[in-house]
Amino acid sequence: MATDPRKILVTCALPYANGSIHLGHMLEHIQADIWVRYQRLRGNDINFICADDAHGTPIMLKAQQMGITPEEMIAAVSEEHQKDFAGFDISFDNYHSTHSDENRELASSIYLELKKNGFITSRTISQLFDPEKEMFLPDRFVKGTCPKCKSEEQYGDNCDNCGETYSPTDLINPKSAVSGATPVMKDSEHFFFDLPQFESMLKEWTRSGSLQTETANKMQEWFESGLQQWDISRDAPYFGFEIPGETNKFFYVWLDAPIGYMGSFKNLCDKRDDLDFDEYWKLNSTTELYHFIGKDIVYFHSLFWPAMLDGAGFRKPNNVFVHGYVTVNGAKMSKSKGTFIKAGTYLNHLDPECLRYYYAAKLNSRIDDIDLNLEDFTQRVNSDVVNKIVNLASRNAGFITKRFDGKLSDNFVAPELYNEFVAASDRIAELYETREFSRAIREITALADKANQYIDEKAPWVLAKEEGKEQELQEVASVGINLFRVLMAYLKPVMPELAARTEAFLNETLTWECIAQPLTSHEITKFKALFNRIDPKKVEAMVEESKEDAAIEMAAKEKAEAEKEKANQTELDKEPIADEIEFDAFEAVDMRIARIISCEEIPKANKLLKFQLDIGGETRQVFSGIKSAYTPEELVGKHTVMVANLKPRKMKFGMSEGMILAAGPGGKDLWILEPHEGAQPGMRVM
């Protein structure tokens, strides 16, 4: 008896809206998409959503550096993110943003409900404050010397050199990473979510058996360490949502980020008549809710998020599926080595289905790191997908289309072998359901080996040359096509584009149920290449492009840092005071007040202006290199200061009888000295 379709809501962690998607992000989104596509293939009612995490200090500051608004920046990033995900066939039903009306309303209502129920407290805390930018500094925006190993330029929460963790106030010689100023301590009222009140509920949820063992064990460690109240507020200036009823107080990004799951789903519900938001999020909902996340954000998703939902009267997730990190060639992704590969860079060179297959061949239900070994990646995809699976179709299709007008045999001559393939469906289904994708791939490729063994033994290429073997040739080739059909039905969640091309070739939609019986007396279309081998040169080109991108990015970063450092320099930093002189040397310089009688440009002189100066009973001619800063009309009639006893200097355009004093670095940034009213031409400057 058929069961009703399951109603399932699936989310991926929200990518932060201040950078590009890379192959580390893609592990999670591919893992989730394979699971979602499998559920759709089995007829379940599933909705797959995501959004950009679009709030926080880093976004605010990066937008300032770019000279645009945060809204403009996150809109551009969202467009890039969605393009990359579409390029990898991630089949979201909705992709939204945490900076949305839906999310603002939900975050505010959840906060107010938590406050009403007694789960929000407030107290005054002391934080580091940037006196120049007039902003409180998050840990990562304070730099200084590590208190343990004394390494310089370390962040305010941990040392990259020795691994020590500490408070920003423990840093030696702390500096604001925003302005370079020395931060000061300043008090501010902050709001806290009272997480310890939910300890019993969280322990019960942990013991329910639905969480991964590693996650449950980690939560037990946190329980033993003691749960702490969670600071959910930030002070202005901040890019985010203001806390209802407060002034210049904003929700911390990690409060409204997970609520972004709800906001994205609410946005989807508003677009469709067949979805009810409350059905999926109400307390005791019978629908299923699953979050796919990386192991770096387990703390938020296994403690704060379910506690917030519970405290505000919503349902909790059925499970949080956690995966490990991605390494490349056995090491952390490296920009200098070209192994920090952006999704867009990958798509410039390689088929996204290659990565989907390779990740699937490595993924399991545990929190294991996945290594993308580029040499193994090439060999694995070429060996499994091209040589074993697609080759089944290419080896047999030509015989059917050329010799039998594209029609498969009326008889199926290998029922036992076919039944063995079909019998694997329950095992493979269970492996997909439990996210044991690598084991599912091993099952599928083992079947592919058996199919190729059958074709090798029957040798249709030999039968094609023998008279009277036409029927046997058609039957053998038809078996090969049918076995390929079963394999592609099993691979459809992993390689949807290859499956779509296969469906066009077979002239049939691949479903989990259709493979129960082989195709007989069925017409297929002319075979076209379904999948191309990975060319190692394209992999190399991808790595080289990643290196070039990293070099450009580093150069831009260094330029920005140099400009920032220059902007933070004092005038004495830029030009230190000259060596000391004796008073007699200073007294020898005769500076006088001068009135500018006339000023004119000199033909063919790029920098010089020609002056006639009244110094109280005497007129001097002076040439001065301030043409880039002033027009002659601006200067006539002004009083200024000149060195009157400088030895006259013969120049190309005439004799210069002194020097006008000006301040500034040069170019347009020059200012002549102008004395106060009352100073008369000829007066000596003392």
Swiss-Prot record:
Cofactor: Zn(2+)
GO biological processes: methionyl-tRNA aminoacylation
Residue span of motif 'KMSKS' region: 332-336
Database matches in CDD domains: Anticodon_Ia_Met, MetRS_core, tRNA_bind_EcMetRS_like
Location relative to the cell: Cytoplasm
Record-linked InterPro entries: aa-tRNA-synth_I_CS, Anticodon_Met, Met-tRNA-synth_bsu_C, Met-tRNA_ligase_1, Met-tRNA_synth, Methionyl/Leucyl_tRNA_Synth, MetRS_core, MetRS_Zn
Catalysed conversion reaction: tRNA(Met) + L-methionine + ATP = L-methionyl-tRNA(Met) + AMP + diphosphate
Cofactor binding mode and count: Binds 1 zinc ion per subunit.
Keywords noted in UniProt: Aminoacyl-tRNA synthetase, ATP-binding, Cytoplasm, Ligase, Metal-binding, Nucleotide-binding, Protein biosynthesis, RNA-binding, tRNA-binding, Zinc
Keyword Mitochondrion: no
Binding residues annotated for Zn(2+), in chain numbering: 146, 149, 159, 162
Residue ranges annotated for the tRNA-binding domain, each copy included: 585-686
Pfam families: Anticodon_3 (PF19303), tRNA-synt_1g (PF09334), tRNA_bind (PF01588)
A cellular-component GO term for this protein: cytosol
Short sequence motif named 'HIGH' region, residue ranges: 15-25
Keyword tRNA-binding: yes
Signal peptide extent: none
Record's subunit section: Homodimer.
Family that this chain belongs to: Belongs to the class-I aminoacyl-tRNA synthetase family. MetG type 1 subfamily.
Function: Is required not only for elongation of protein synthesis but also for the initiation of all mRNA translation through initiator tRNA(fMet) aminoacylation.
Annotated HAMAP family: Met_tRNA_synth_type1
NCBIfam families: metG, metG_C_term, PRK00133.1
Full protein name: Methionine--tRNA ligase
Taxonomic source organism: Aliivibrio salmonicida (strain LFI1238) (Vibrio salmonicida (strain LFI1238))
Gene: metG
